Structure formats: C-alpha cells, structure tokens
Amino acid sequence: MVIVWEAVGATILPNIGGWLSTPLTIKSVKGWYKTLARPSWTPPDYVFGPVWTCLYTGMGFASYLVWRDGGGFSGEAKTALTLYGAQLAINWAWSPIFFGLHKIGAGLVIAVSLWGTAGAAALAMSRVNQTAGLLMVPYMMWLTLANTISFYLWRNNPPRKDKKKE
C-alpha cells in the first residue's frame, strides 16, 4: 500500500483549526452559549464536533483532488485552491470571534461571508474535479443551517449592557 502524503496532509489541514479552537469552544458552550436564546431546531451540542470533523475531512480531501487533477497550486487549480484557502481562513476566524469574544453580530457577518466564499470555492473545485465539488455539498448544507442559526441568535439575543456593542 502506498500512502499519498499529499492527500493525508490536505485532509488533516482543515481539521487543525477545529482542533485549535476546541478548548475555547467547549468553555463557551458550557457557559455563555447556554444563556443564549437558541432556535428549537438547533442540533444538540454533542453533534457539532463529529459533524465538523467529517466536514473538514471531506473538504480537505476535496482540496487534494483539485490539487492533484488541476496541476498543483498553479494552472487550473489556482482559483479553486485560492478560494478554498480563503474560505478556510474565514471558517477558522468564526469560533474565536463568536465563542471567544461573544460577538454574535460579527459572527453572523463572518458566517454569511463564509457561505459565499465556500460556495464559490465549491463551484470552482467542481470545475476541476466533480467529486471534489460533490464533497463540498454537505459542507454547504451545514453552512446554510449555521447561517440560519446565526441569524436567529443575532435577532433574538440583543447585545448585553455589560458587554461592548457588537
């Protein structure tokens, strides 16, 4: 069996941001987040870790397929991988802003930006490798749910007087 280290690295890379934000997220979920008015259709807290691990793994492998089939970081893959990197950076920014700083409004802006950038990345990736585009579909569906939750949280949790305005 031959291990394709590029595939392994690309698959692990997006998970790193999730792993790094886990302590901050857990602390906030056990405290501040529990005080928020949340929609009844919000998935249970224990679902988020496994779902994000699957989504990060799928998008990471999708990026490998694009890199492999699109000629590396130049040529056909350049736009798709640039958009992928941009959406990954936006994704990683959300947890510290939302869970760390408790900025619901800024979290919503980031979530909407992420949805648009990830959608553009998914389309660009599908032009290079159709399977890569399909691997991004569950992520886009989850981001759609996340955006509706973010909007609900923003609408139903006004800034607190003891906190800076969002």
Indicate residue ranges for each PLM-predicted region.
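Helical transmembrane-bundle signal
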Residues: N15-W19, Y56-A62, L88-N91, T117-A121, ...
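Hydrophobic alpha-helical segments of small multi-pass membrane proteins
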Residues: L81-W94, G107-A121, M136-T144
